[in-house]
Curated annotation (Swiss-Prot):
Taxonomic classification: Eukaryota, Viridiplantae, Streptophyta, Embryophyta, Tracheophyta
Lineage top rank: taxon: Eukaryota
Chain positions recorded as heme binding sites: 422
Name by which UniProt lists this protein: Abscisic acid 8'-hydroxylase CYP707A1
Organism: Solanum lycopersicum
A cellular component annotation (GO) from this entry: membrane
Function: Involved in the oxidative degradation of abscisic acid, especially in pollinated ovaries.
Chief location category: membrane
Amino acid sequence: MVNYFEIFLYISMFVLGYLSYYFCFGKNNNSSSKKNAYKLPPGSMGWPYIGETLQLYSQDPNAFFINRQRRFGEIFKTKILGCPCVMLASPEAARFVLVNQANLFKPTYPKSKENLIGQSAIFFHQGDYHNHLRKLVQAPLNPESIRNQIPYIEELSISALNSWVGGHVVNTYHEMKKFSFEVGILAIFGHLDGHVKEELKKNYSIVDKGYNSFPINLPGTLYRKALQARKKLGKILSEIIREMKEKKTLEKGLLSCFLNAKEEKGFLVLNEDQIADNIIGVLFAAQDTTASVLTWIIKYLHDNPKLLECVKAEQKVIWQSNEQENHGLTWTQTRKMPITSRVVLETLRMASIISFAFREAVADVEYKGYLIPKGWKVMPLFRNIHHNPEFFPDPQKFDPSRFENAPKPNTFMPFGSGVHACPGNELAKLEILIMTHHLVTKFRWEVVGSGSGIQYGPFPVPLGGLAARFWKTTST
C-alpha cells in the first residue's frame, strides 16, 4: 500500500530543496532551456519541481502514461520527482534509445536504489565494465548451463505447490516470490546451507520491502531498515564467499563464475563488494518479475477454462510419457510446449511486468524534430507498445493465439532490448514452464473473491497478490 505520509514528507523535502536551489542558482540556469523550449516534445511539466508526481502516484500508472500518449502523441514530456522526462511509446523510438543510439543514453536509477542494491551492479553501468559483467553473468544463465538445473527446479516447484494444498487461502504472489527466490539462490550459489539461506532470505526481504518505499533515511522508516539490512547482507555474502574460496571445487553457478573470473582487458577480478552488488542485483531482477508473471498465469488460466483445458492436455501428454519412462522433464520437452509457451508470451504482453526502461541522455539528442536535452530522463514505454491495437488487435483480450505468428519487429519487448536486455530471460522462461507443467498436471485451484484489480509495487500484480485455494488432483 502507498504510505501517503511518506509521500508528503518526501515531496515536501524536495520542494524546500528546490526553492533554495532556485533562489540561489535558478536565474542563471534558465536561459538555455528557454532558448530550446520550442524544440521540446509536447506535454505538461506540471507543478514546479514535483511536476506530475502526484498524478502518477494517485492513479494507475499505466493509465497515466496512456492518457498522455492519447493527448500528446507517441513522444511527450513530463516531470516526475523533480526530473524532466521524455516518454517514448513507439517501437521505432524504443529501438532508437535502446539499440541504435544506446551510447547516447545511459542507464539511470534513483540514488536510493543504487544504495540498496550496490553501485557496482550490472544494470547501473554501460560500456566496457558493463560488457565485462554481462559476459560473466550470462555464462551460468545460458541454455547450455541452465538445462542441468531442471531436476532441481522441478523439486522446488513440487515442494512449493505441495505447501499450498489443503484448502487454506494462499497469497499467490507472495508464494511465487518464495519459489523464484529459491530458484535464484540455486542459480547463484548452487546448494546453500539452510541456516545461511534463511539469514540471506530474512535480510533480503527487508531490503526488498524498502526498495520501493520513499527514501527517507529516518529511524523507523522502511528505507532506513532496508539500508541496515543491506549492510548485513554484505557481511553474509562475504562469509559465503570466504567459505567458497576455501573449497577446492566450487558448485556451478553465478558466484563460481565471479570467483573464477580472470583478469581481462584491463579489468581486475571482481572484489567482494562488486560480487555482492551483482549478486543482490541479480536476485532483485529475478524474483519479483518472475513471481509476477507466474501469478498472472494462474489468474489468466483460471479466467479462461477452455484455454486451461488445452494447456492441461498438452502437459498431460508429457507427464504420461515421463511417468512411463520414470524420469522428469527434459530440456527438449520444455522446448516443445507450443500452447503453454504462447500462454507465457501472452501473459508477458498483457501484464507487461517491465512497463518501461530508465535511461538518461548523455548529450543533447534530436529525434524526429524534437530535442531530448542532456540530463533528461528517457523512458521507452513497453506497456504502451504492447497494448497498442495497431500491433496487437483487441489488446485487452487475453489471446495466446496471437503468438502463432511472430510479432512485428520491436513491438514485443518483455525482457527489454539491446545490451541491457535481461540476461536471465532463458532461466525465467524455464522456471515458468516447469512450474506451469506441475501446476496443471497435479493441482487444481480457485481464485478467492473477484480477483479483479491491479496493484503496483512497482511491478503489476493482481490486487491482494491473488488470493487462491489449491488442491492436489489425481492425474490419469
